[in-house]
Amino acid sequence: MAILGLQGVRGGVGTTSLTAALAWALQILGENVLVIDASPDNLLRMSFNVDFVHQGGWARSLLDGQDWRDAGLRYTSQLDLLPFGQLTAQERENPQSWQETLGEIGSAIQALKASGRYSWILLDLPYGASPLTRQLVSLCDHTLAIARVDANCHIRLHQQALPAGAHILINDLRIGSQLQDDLYQVWLQSQRRLLPIVIHRDEAMAECMASKQPLGEYRSDSLAAEEVLTLANWCLLHDAGDKTSAGSLR
């Protein structure tokens, strides 16, 4: 099994919606998936039909001294969700007060991996490098750095470090945009970790969260859903390739 982290090169690039879409695609392919919201924004739940007023989550449980496992939610027989949980206004203003407590989730994720219960654990990671985020990134077997083809992300790709071994996944690529086409050609020549898969702009991606469903469940026939399914297959092949390479060293 593998722990896969998805993190935006900046905020607002669609990481959360992509995480939900990839989790759905992997379970469509027969994989057992746990998707974990690692962001204090607590938005991943909104892609899995969780009531807006639901405040529970693994972080909320740890802060309240409760068992984080009770915060897990079943979406399908092969897809489970672990929301972050809602922080209070005071907690949001003082993140340093809870970073250490929430660090306990690291050992929990390692135990889940060792149990073999899930084929994949997907982490929806927030942008930035807080102590908690750095800890979770270090647990990942693979990391996808989500980027949009714009000047903002172009600059960031040259001035901020990506997680070790991360692959860059382009999201929201617009057909007919001269600027995006020019930058994309530059990235093809300069970004050695660029994935050979692109997620194009698709209205279904915006609509699915409004419908509180993962992309592939909401519109399986959409272009973006088909591209995410291709991404899921790439993840399976890439993970299998890593295991084969590791085995050949013995």
UniProtKB/Swiss-Prot annotation:
Pfam families: CBP_BcsQ (PF06564)
Gene Ontology MF terms: ATP binding; ATP hydrolysis activity
UniProt binding sites for ATP: V9, R10, G11, G12, V13, G14, T15, T16
Keyword set includes Nucleotide-binding: yes
Family annotation (Gene3D superfamilies): P-loop containing nucleotide triphosphate hydrolases
Domain of life: Bacteria
Keyword GTP-binding attached: no
GO cellular component terms given for this protein: cytoplasmic side of plasma membrane; cytosol
Keyword entries, A-Z: ATP-binding, Cytoplasm, Nucleotide-binding
Family per record: Belongs to the BcsQ family.
Role noted for this protein: Essential for cellulose biosynthesis. May play a role in subcellular localization of an active cellulose biosynthesis apparatus at the bacterial cell pole.
Protein name as it appears in the record: Cellulose biosynthesis protein BcsQ
Lineage of origin: Bacteria, Pseudomonadati, Pseudomonadota, Gammaproteobacteria, Enterobacterales
Underlying gene: bcsQ
